[in-house]
Amino acid sequence: MYIIAFFLRINIFDLFTLCACLDINLTKELNILSIDAGIKKEDIIVDPDTGCIGYGIDYGYSIIERMIEAKNNGDDMLDVPIIVFSGLESYKAKEAKSKNLGEIWGESKTRSYAWEIATTTALICAGVDIAVLWHPEIVDELKRSFQGIC
């Protein structure tokens, strides 16, 4: 069954990150099947598998919003934390990782950091509970940015 391919991305400290590739209905079904298989709901974290800036983040953003709206309207099967791997997604973009884009694109390191910051900021604004980043400098930058807002 195709569910198995999406079932388990990581299992750390007895928490399960379930990935359902930008499909809210499949996410809900996966949560139900996981609970039926014996995983406790409080041990589940959902990864909607969103893209980065320029590569489908708008669709991922809307899926996250719909999950949160369903959770707020009492959908118990979507009432689980949402995690995004924004660092990983950011570095899939050719604009973030390519060293051959020319001077107009700027230095590779600066560009990749900007891609990760923009992607993570958008996903935090969408309402994710956990954002996994790649660079400690980005964590510090985002903390400074959000201190003025929160």
Locate the predicted segments by residue.
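Catalytic alpha/beta core domains of metabolic enzymes, predominantly
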Residues: Y2-I3, R9-S145
